[in-house]
């Protein structure tokens, strides 16, 4: 396992965790991921792995390993928000996610509205809500209007499919509708706590 951070090393490490059958391997992988958390590019790379539903098209790793690596990446991302979204000191080193990186992350997170894996989508909805608690409306004023637009457009597409009796072909708008509603529900839940 490569100990220097890079996006490919992160993918390999997450895949190793996804196929690990023993506690020692999981502990080693977890320790490596903990070290990388302080790297500035780690959070965007982690999110890229988590939301890359088509990244294993050449079958480099078994499908179930790839899916589990994506899920693990999203869970680690979600769990790191409360710890690293705001600047902090870790082992006497300032850990900061730049404003530009945060903006890219917020934009990329909304790709979850089209996420085919339910487990990734659920964890991403919680991650969005945690970030929204800190950044909405100041840094992320477009969050609620974007979710509202997604809900309206997806509902209209589902309705049109139902009227034309092609509801079986409306899986993508239905998925978007469900995910947008789930993200909004998680945000409201986070705002009221």
Language-model features: locations:
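Basic, Lys/Arg- and aromatic-enriched nucleic-acid-binding interface segment
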Residues: 173
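Compositionally biased, intrinsically disordered low-complexity segments enriched
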Residues: 153-163
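Alpha-helical solenoid scaffolds in large eukaryotic transport, assembly, and signaling factors
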Residues: 2-151, 176-193
């Amino acid at each position: 396992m490569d100990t220097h951070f890079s996006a490919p090393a992160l993918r390999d490490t997450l895949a190793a965790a996804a196929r690990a059958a023993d506690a020692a391997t999981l502990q080693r992988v977890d320790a490596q991921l903990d070290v990388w958390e302080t790297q500035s590019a780690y959070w965007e790379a982690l999110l890229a792995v988590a939301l890359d539903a088509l990244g294993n098209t050449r079958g480099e790793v078994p499908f179930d390993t790839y899916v589990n690596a994506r899920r693990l990446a999203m869970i680690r991302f979600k769990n790191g928000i409360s710890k690293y979204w705001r600047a902090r000191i870790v082992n006497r080193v300032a850990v900061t996610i730049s404003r530009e990186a945060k903006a890219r992350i917020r934009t990329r997170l909304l790709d979850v509205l089209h996420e085919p894996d339910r487990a990734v989508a659920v964890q991403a909805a919680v991650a969005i809500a945690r970030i929204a608690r800190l950044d909405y409306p100041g840094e992320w004023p477009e969050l609620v209007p974007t979710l509202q637009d997604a809900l309206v457009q997806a509902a209209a597409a589902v309705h049109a499919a139902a009227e034309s009796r092609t509801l079986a072909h409306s899986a993508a708008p239905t998925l978007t509708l469900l995910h947008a509603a789930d993200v909004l529900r998680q945000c409201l839940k986070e705002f009221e706590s």
